[in-house]
């Protein structure tokens, strides 16, 4: 984001592991923040913070609600009180039904909070739903890492790739750089009051992705709460923003296997 805009960027997070050294960084748990203006005067706030991943949400639903829903309410109120536009990162899991798992429910409540403050408190906001984001610096360890990150770590440890279920579930993978491009376009075009679906519009089976890595695959019992399919079919981001995702998962995997996972490639 910093490479593509002239804005001064302030990062507020509880981990600085992937924070650039030239950003202004505040180490906070957003559940403890009530007034974001103490960090400065902002032109816009990108609310990208969430406790993610479906499976851990069954064990720790309270953490998901307090972070993804309650903290979003406090942020939305701060933005509306101070006339700061808000871009909220929603989830493609919305389409599997809000009661599918605690994570999806908590993110949907966050969306509803944003809509409520738009309708009744004058909040200028847009919701951007992310589809299976991957790319450089994604987590590779712990319960909150992505599928691609998990498999990269297993490859680095010379372990087989684990598939839960039969591998036929399908996912629409979107590169983080394409996500950033869309967020910048929302800001540049003042595209407020929208819900944008940020997916490539092409999905792959989990087995297909595993085969792209060319490593041994192990199968385990399926896990609850997972959607069978994610696929972005909405064209609003293209129609309104002129956004076109440029990066694809095949090239990313090839680059990773050849030690070039940070190189930007296009179809």
Region annotations inferred by a language model:
Residues 1-19:
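Single conserved hydrophobic/aromatic residue that forms the stacking wall/gate
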Residues 94-102, 126-146:
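Flexible, glycine-rich beta-alpha linker
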Residues 17, 176, 208, 223-255, ...:
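Conserved C-terminal active-site "lid" loop/helix of NAD(P)H-dependent oxidoreductases
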Residues 86, 90-91, 113-137, 162, ...:
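Conserved beta-loop-beta element that borders a ligand/cofactor-binding pocket
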Residues 30-66:
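NAD(P)H-binding glycine-rich loop region in Rossmannoid oxidoreductase-like domains
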Residues 108, 133-149, 157-164, 168, ...:
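Glycine/proline-rich active-site loop of Rossmann-fold NAD(P)-dependent oxidoreductases
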Residues 47, 70-104, 126:
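Conserved Rossmann-fold NAD(P)-dependent oxidoreductase catalytic core, especially the SDR/UDP-sugar
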Residues 166, 195-196, 204-210, 214-234:
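C-terminal "lid/loop" region of Rossmann-like NAD(P)-dependent oxidoreductases
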């Amino acid at each position: 984001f910093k490479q593509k805009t002239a804005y001064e960027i302030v990062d507020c997070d509880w981990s600085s592991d992937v924070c650039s050294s030239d950003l202004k960084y505040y180490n906070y748990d957003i559940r403890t923040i009530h007034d974001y203006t103490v960090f400065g005067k902002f032109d816009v706030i990108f609310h990208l913070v969430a406790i993610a991943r479906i499976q851990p949400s069954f064990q720790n639903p309270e953490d998901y609600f307090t972070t993804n829903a309650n903290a979003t309410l406090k942020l939305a109120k701060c933005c509306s009180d101070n006339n700061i536009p808000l871009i909220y990162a929603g989830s493609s899991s919305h389409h599997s039904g809000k009661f599918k798992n605690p994570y999806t429910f908590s993110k949907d409540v966050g969306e509803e909070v944003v809509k409520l403050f738009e309708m009744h408190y004058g909040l200028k906001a847009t919701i951007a739903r992310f589809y299976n984001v991957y790319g450089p610096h994604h987590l590779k360890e712990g319960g909150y890492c992505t599928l691609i990150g998990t498999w990269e770590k297993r490859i680095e440890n010379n372990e087989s790739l684990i598939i839960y279920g039969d591998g036929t579930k399908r996912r629409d993978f979107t590169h983080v750089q394409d996500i950033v491009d869309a967020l910048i376009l929302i800001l540049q075009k003042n595209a407020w009051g929208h819900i944008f679906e940020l997916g490539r519009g092409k999905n792959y089976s989990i087995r297909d992705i595993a085969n792209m890595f060319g490593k041994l695959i192990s199968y385990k019992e399926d896990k609850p709460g997972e959607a069978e399919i994610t696929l972005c079919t909405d064209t609003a981001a293209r129609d309104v923003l002129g956004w076109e995702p440029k990066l694809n998962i095949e090239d990313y995997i090839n680059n990773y296997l050849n030690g070039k996972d940070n190189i930007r490639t296009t179809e």
